[in-house]
């Protein structure tokens, strides 16, 4: 009877041990760096959106704290400022944002031990925008900075050994929350905070990300099966008696 009880206990322990958990991450695990580029255009006030495209290029550095939630810092430089008159500089505008990232595929589908070939990631956050210029019109205005808000979806494709690389396509909308650029083309921060389509632009970028190797030997989160070896050894000893 005692052995039967011990056998049941061993079976229960086996089932418990089969439960999977994420291996604990260290401080510098799950960090990535990426480059991106594409085009943007003002959402309203265009005489044909194709003629108002503004090229941009950017850098993103981020960290995933779990397979679902992470943060990133991103900076993009814009090389045109259509539909307005050129500001006279190579880089016309920069936007630097602190972003929250949510892996919707892992949230709703669970994490399976490695990234899926295709994932959808929500991206949102606040940023600082700065307008550059060297002409008289620019110098005559007071405000060249504004508060921005980026809302985006990344359609990401993971590839390479250990899924260390990721390519993504990102449609986004970026609001100038406190500017009146539809009224004064070079005067940004002179209005209250608001979500206004006239103070926004849409953007389509593509990006390439590299995920650094982690302490678990892979480039992503790792699932492990927790075991208490001391308890297992004790039960084996009792079964043998």
Task: List PLM regions with ranges.
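Transmembrane beta-strands of outer-membrane beta-barrel pores
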Residues: 37-43, 75-81, 104-106, 126-132, ...
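Short glycine/proline- and aromatic-enriched beta-strand/turn motifs that initiate or cap beta-hairpins
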Residues: 20-62
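Hydrophobic, lipid-facing positions within transmembrane beta-strands of outer-membrane proteins
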Residues: 31, 55-59, 94-98, 102, ...
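Residue-level detector of the transmembrane beta-barrel scaffold of outer-membrane proteins
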Residues: 32-34, 70-72, 121-123, 166-170, ...
């Amino acid at each position: 009877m005692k052995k039967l009880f011990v056998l049941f206990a061993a079976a229960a322990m086996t089932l418990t041990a089969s439960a999977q958990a994420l291996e604990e991450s260290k401080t510098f695990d799950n960090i990535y760096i990426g480059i991106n580029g594409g085009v943007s255009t003002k959402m309203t006030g265009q005489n044909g959106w194709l003629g108002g495209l503004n090229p941009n290029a950017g850098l993103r550095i981020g960290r995933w704290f779990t397979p679902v939630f992470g943060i990133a810092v991103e900076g993009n430089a814009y090389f045109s400022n259509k539909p307005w008159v050129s500001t006279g500089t190579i880089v016309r505008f920069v936007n630097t944002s602190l972003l929250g990232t949510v892996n919707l595929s892992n949230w709703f589908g669970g994490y399976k031990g490695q990234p899926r070939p295709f994932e959808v990631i929500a991206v949102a956050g606040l940023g600082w925008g700065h307008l550059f210029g060297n002409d008289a019109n620019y110098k005559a205005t007071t405000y060249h900075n504004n508060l921005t808000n980026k809302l985006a979806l990344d359609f990401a494709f993971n590839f390479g050994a250990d899924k260390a690389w990721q390519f993504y396509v990102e449609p986004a909308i970026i609001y100038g929350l406190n500017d009146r650029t539809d009224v004064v083309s070079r005067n940004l921060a002179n209005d209250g905070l608001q979500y206004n389509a006239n103070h926004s632009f849409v953007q389509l970028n593509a990006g390439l990300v590299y995920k650094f190797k982690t302490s678990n030997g892979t480039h992503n989160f790792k699932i492990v099966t927790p075991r208490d070896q001391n308890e297992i050894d004790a039960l084996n000893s009792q079964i043998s008696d």
